[in-house]
């Protein structure tokens, strides 16, 4: 169970890393082209400004004829940490629940408490009597006429085989 959770988390990080080619570091420290226009540092010099493809190959940002460096994206980093925290917390809760259930079953502790046992036994008797009433209501009497003209009466229960000869 733990292995499958770790594998799923590794796959998530690998897939995210293949998108922006930063790998796991790109997950924990994402970069972005967003931000204040005045805080941009130029990237690639004049050649990158004249050739947007060169700017992008240098893994820089290009906008409005300006090639500039990417900057750390704190909002995305917070979102990634939040998602990672919830994923790990949920996985830990799931593993703990499974282990606790397994332990309780081995200790033979999966019984109802005494104060609930009486209430549930009364409830099961009520449900049992209701199901008996339902079965008796489903019984019906059918009249069959044989080829010789004799009339036969047969009791049929819906959903059950009567077990008689044909």
UniProtKB/Swiss-Prot annotation:
Membrane-protein topology: Single-pass type I membrane protein
One term of GO molecular function: identical protein binding
Region (Disordered): 130-166
GO biological process annotation, one example: hematopoietic progenitor cell differentiation
Localization terms from the record: Membrane
Keyword terms: Disulfide bond, Membrane, Signal, Transmembrane, Transmembrane helix
Tissue distribution of the protein: Detected in testis and in a mixture of spermatogenic cells at various stages (testicular germ cells). Not detected in heart, brain, spleen, lung, liver, skeletal muscle and kidney.
Extracellular side: 22-81
Boundaries of every P-type domain copy: 31-71
PANTHER family in the record: TRANSMEMBRANE PROTEIN 190
Protein name in the entry: Transmembrane protein 190
Source species of the chain: Mus musculus
Lineage, highest ranks first: Eukaryota, Metazoa, Chordata, Craniata, Vertebrata
Designated gene of the protein: Tmem190
């Amino acid at each position: 169970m733990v292995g499958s959770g770790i594998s799923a988390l590794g796959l998530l990080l690998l897939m995210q890393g293949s998108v922006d080619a930063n790998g796991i570091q790109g997950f924990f420290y994402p970069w972005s082209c967003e931000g204040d226009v005045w805080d941009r540092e130029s990237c690639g010099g004049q050649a990158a400004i004249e050739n947007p493809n060169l700017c992008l190959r240098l893994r820089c940002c290009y906008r409005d004829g300006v090639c500039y460096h990417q900057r750390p994206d704190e909002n995305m980093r917070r979102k990634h940490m939040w998602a990672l925290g919830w994923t790990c917390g949920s996985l830990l809760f799931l593993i703990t629940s499974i282990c606790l259930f397994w332990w309780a079953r081995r200790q033979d502790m999966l019984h109802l408490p005494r104060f609930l046992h009486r209430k549930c036994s009364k409830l099961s008797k009520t449900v049992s009597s209701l199901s008996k009433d339902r079965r008796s209501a489903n019984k019906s009497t059918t009249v069959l006429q044989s080829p010789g003209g004799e009339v036969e009466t047969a009791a049929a229960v819906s959903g059950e085989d009567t077990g008689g000869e044909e």
